[in-house]
Amino acid sequence: GLVSGKQYVVGLKGYKNTSSGGQIVSAETLSSPVTMVEPKKADVTLKAQNAVNIDGTDTIKSSNAVIDLVSDMNVSGEWSLDSGEMSGTVSEKTMSQSINLDGLEDGTHIITFKGENDSKDGTLSEYMFTVDTLPPRLQISSPNNGGFFEDTVTVKGISDSGAKVYIDAENQEIQEVTVGDDGSFEKTVTLDNSMAYQNIVVYAADEIGNETVPVT
């Protein structure tokens, strides 16, 4: 095959068949030397806006995604999501374009771009991201609603491993606790003992920012 960086010459001869069954061949004509240029494919990256990297995968908390396509040279081509579930074109030569993906289901998705630059050199890029719109679970086992306490109270419960639980006691700073690997959490908070009755509000949030409905 042809090798980039080397020079090649194209030779051309004409011929004519004679009535006697012979053949007349012209002198060979040679082209000027042609250097095979190494293809310079575009470096194209795809990335979801507002993504958070969780366990090595970009994650967004919306079912509507905006994917930014950025190239180091002008490109055009086609994109597809999940082997054709959605698809579109980048018809004009460009170095950047935003791709809108609406109505995505929770889970992992792959978007693929296949295109070429001004020199017709091809390029192929893939990008995997995850959609997570669900908040973590939250169950409070202690304290009991309407219970009597003095200066402190211990809040216990269950949530998703790695989530953050926030405990908001009236007139106190909000306390934060990380849920353990087994899903349990426990935190002792100080109460304002000048108040005869007070609310404690508890809610949880995952790494991407999905929050539970507060529990009082």
Where are the predicted features?
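Low-complexity, disordered linker/stalk regions enriched in Pro/Thr/Ser/Gly
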Residues: 4-216
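Tryptophan-paired
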Residues: 1
